Amino acid sequence: MYCVQCEQTMVTPMGNGCSFGQGMCGKTAETSDLQDLLIACLHSLSAWALKAREHGIINHDADNFAPRAFFATLTNVNFDSNRIVGYAQQAIIYRNELIKAISEVEPNPELNHPLAHIELKGISIDQLAEQAKEFALDTDRAEIGEEVHGVRLLALYGLKGAAAYLEHAYVLGKFDNDLYVEYHGFMAWLGTKPSDLNELLEKSLAIGSMNFKVMAMLDAGETETFGNPVPATVNIRPVKGKCILISGHDLKDLKELLEQTEGKGINVYTHGEMLPAHGYPELKKYKHLVGNYGSGWQNQQKEFARFPGAIVMTSNCLIDPNVGDYADRIFTCNIVGWPGVVHLEKHNFAPVIEKALECDGFPYTELEHYITVGFGRKTLIDASDAVIDLVKAGKLSHVFVIGGCDGDKEERHYYTDLAYALPKDTAVLTLGCGKYRFNKLDFGTIDGGLPRLLDAGQCNDTYSAIMLAVTLSQKLGIGLNELPLSIVLSWFEQKAIIVLLTLLALGVKNVYSGPSKPAFLNDNVMNLLHEKFGLSGLTTPEQDFGHIINK
């Protein structure tokens, strides 16, 4: 096992990365190795998908499958070895279908790629786990050096985050052939184990550029399906009655669940990154979507254990449900998986509903406590003139974008301290589950109007923040980096990595990121990123605030 993709990975004087029987996330060495094998198969699939396009051959099923299967290897998504093997087998099936189709117009097609003809050596978990060791991500680490190894992983993990957003968009009916060509190009290239540092940095930024287009496509999918988010208050206290909790990012799953539970006397609560759902008109109209429950994903083992109903995981982040003894009432769907947990197919939530009706539900209604969400792209852009007026009047001095992934490190209290300590003439734009560090605090308003805390949505709604910045830049006639706006990113996994690469690709400089640096990037690479882009780590809220304001 060698896995170094998330913030909680092991960091020791002997080396970084989880490399024993189980990762810090709970992923076994077996599953981790099989994920490496799956990735190798996906490299091969992408290489042949590109070759097929030279002949005008497009297999849309293969295109859709490729990023979805890659998403399954993202942190805290799929821990089920059998499911991972199934994805690898399907990747080879699609690859062979492409080769067959190409052969009809180009007999005995040739492809110069090291993984062009990879085959699975066996069908059992043990056989494939043994083969998987050949494809560990650190096999040539000593040969190429830490810098090249780290930036190659930066590109791979960034592409993994972009693959997740491609899948989220596809679920909502959004598909762009040109973006899939770009995706396959990057995936095939990474399968060649590139080792030129400058090329790796350039490609990493190119992956970020691609992801900006992916986020735009996802934004269109969400707003066309559910309407533009509008500011809305959300109750964060329990309501008496039977209940279902839904977590993850897939708003379509929530819509299906709301339709199937309507009129059944079951209250539905959002958790984690589902919180922004309460701002979408086509979701908030359901009266039995009663509120939000819990906090950041890392607290789920305690909070899910206390939740008296059924639980649905639609995407990341999932952790061991056996610890809190709720494995019999949690369900997975889409690419999520945990051994022994019931997996739902085709949006059939009947087992969830049945379990919810069996459970006790909340015995009484607690005193209501509301927070506000719904500051999506359109709302933010519509407010841009008001923001400019406040800036010109000296009533708004700075906007801080504070968001990203949450996690369980004590150092993450930094984000709470920073947000709460900011002067009253500043505003905080937040997104991602990092918001749970401070989104239940009262920040008040500026000049009696603009809320000081603006929740823009999920991590992919970084797009909304970017479009606000672009709009302000255009209206003020200044560059993005001249705006009184700073970004303090909270990273944990690969979606945050691709968000960072997207920002850097757009030319956004002086981003702060923490609470710690990625374990796969050494000090030399971090210094390089600081020199080229002004990327900085965190110190203390007071020191960083002073540095930002005085720049």
Curated annotation (Swiss-Prot):
Q: Which GO terms describe its molecular function?
A: 2 iron, 2 sulfur cluster binding; hydroxylamine reductase activity; metal ion binding; peroxidase activity
Q: Where in the cell is it found?
A: Cytoplasm
Which GO BP terms apply?
response to hydrogen peroxide
GO CC annotation: cytoplasm
Q: Which residues bind hybrid [4Fe-2O-2S] cluster?
A: 249, 273, 317, 405, 433, 459, 493, 495
- List ligand-binding residues for [2Fe-2S] cluster: 3, 6, 18, 25
Q: What EC number is given for this enzyme?
A: 1.7.99.1
User: Which key words tag this protein in UniProt?
Assistant: 2Fe-2S, Cytoplasm, Iron, Iron-sulfur, Metal-binding, Oxidoreductase
| Catalysed reactions, semicolon-separated | A + NH4(+) + H2O = hydroxylamine + AH2 + H(+)
User: InterPro entries this protein is in?
Assistant: HCP/CODH (IPR004137), Hydroxylam_reduct (IPR010048), Prismane-like_a/b-sand (IPR016099), Prismane-like_sf (IPR011254), Prismane_a-bundle (IPR016100)
Positions carrying Cysteine persulfide are 405
Its EC top class is oxidoreductase
Main subcellular location: cytoplasm
Q: How is the cofactor bound?
A: Binds 1 [2Fe-2S] cluster.
Q: What cofactor is this protein dependent on?
A: [2Fe-2S] cluster; hybrid [4Fe-2O-2S] cluster
Q: So what does this one do?
A: Catalyzes the reduction of hydroxylamine to form NH(3) and H(2)O.
Q: Which family does it belong to?
A: Belongs to the HCP family.
PANTHER family documented for this protein: HYDROXYLAMINE REDUCTASE
Would you tell me the protein name for this molecule? Hydroxylamine reductase
Q: Provide the gene name from the record.
A: hcp
